[in-house]
Amino acid sequence: MKSTENIEKSSIFEKLFKLRENKTTVKTEILAGITTFITMAYIIIVNPNILRFAGMNLPGIKGEGAGAFTALNDPVVASVFAATCLTAAIGTFVMAFYANLPFAQAPGMGLNAFFTYSVCLGLGYTWQQALAAVFISGILFIIITLTSIREKIVDALPQNLKLAISGGIGLFIALIGFKGGGIIVSNKETLVAFGSLTSPSALVTLIGISITAIFMARKIKGSILIGIVITAIVGIPFGITKLAGVKIFSAPPSLAPTFMQFDFAGLLGSGAGKGLFSAIMSVVMVVITFSLVDLFDTIGTLVGTATKAKMLDENGRVKNMNKALMSDALATTAGAIMGTSTVVTYVESTAGVAEGGRTGLTSATVGVLFLASLFFSGLVGIVPTEATAPALVIVGVLMMSSITKIDFEDFTEALPAFLTIAIMPFSYSIANGIAAGIIFYPIVKVATGRYKEVSPIVYVLAGLFIIRFIILP
């Protein structure tokens, strides 16, 4: 009888993923994949819950309160659920078999908020037009990955701005979570205020934040997903979680309501209620924002995780970085086709890497589990906004951690970074935050005679953003 070691040496997994070269085993990789999936599975619940506010549901059932989100009765929301699972599986499989890296992909937190609250609710685009913009950004990402443009853009933006973008998005999605859970409400005199903390919505949300925070502090795997599940259960006696007519197991939902639902004519025409030139400039800004956030989010995750796992090559670069970025670009394009927002490489991949995941077998395992999730669409219908709100707050905390690396001692670096972080939640727009940072960076550098520290690409981007604000005030 062959030993386990000999079996692994001759297995298809060895041939596909070079396990011995990466000093790992089939068992280790599969367990790492399960760990990664558990930590990021919340996205299959949260993503449809955010995109529904962009209008990705049946007319007349948009609602803001508890129980408004019922995937079982809404084929459009169910389609977004299916698109989320399929896109995550496709992107992660490409990462597995093309890049042979242990990183998982799915529609990005922050970018789904940008899609909903900035592009659709803020600029007035329909979700079909927004999906067209995501598709364009995916194609653009493919092109810049095939050329040297990617490296030039990455090198052009200051490191402090890259860190600020992540931190600002964290603050922004935390605000969305607080608002969705009824903890923060609008106020005419003070703009925002505490909601009624004794209301069922706020109580369930606060309990959910506390539970998830405890799990995170104790470093329990799958803390966010477990927190969502427990919070949904807590919501039952409060009347927040509705169980009537729920079927946990079901056939995968149809993609028809969101598949290939692009409106390019509306996007480039009068989709935002502006003239042709203004509409085109608006689209350019939207596409640039989608592309930049996706680019830096993915690169940050890849570099940070690979560094901790000692997966860098002799030049200090992530192995197969270009292939990983191509996986991300292809997944974003596929996601737009199926009906979801921009795909990114998930920072939760670090959980699987910490468990020993070193190859594409880890990500292949994650992909299989996302496909299996298609048969549990009924679970999405159970989970209310109050149960996913804590997840947004906790993810916001994780994303905000990047600001500790910003150089606040240098005012010419601190001001643009601060504006990027602050303006995102205060203007309810990720794009505005990025624009503010990029515009003020060359201003303060030139004012102090340090204009040579600014890349020509940043000057161009700053000019484009200024034009955008003049045309679309």
Where are these regions (language model features)?
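Helix-loop-helix junctions within the multi-pass membrane cores of secondary transporters/permeases
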Residues: K9-N47, T87-A88, F97, G108-I169, ...
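Residue-level signature of catalytic and energy-coupling elements of molecular machines
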Residues: I30, I50, I153, G222, ...
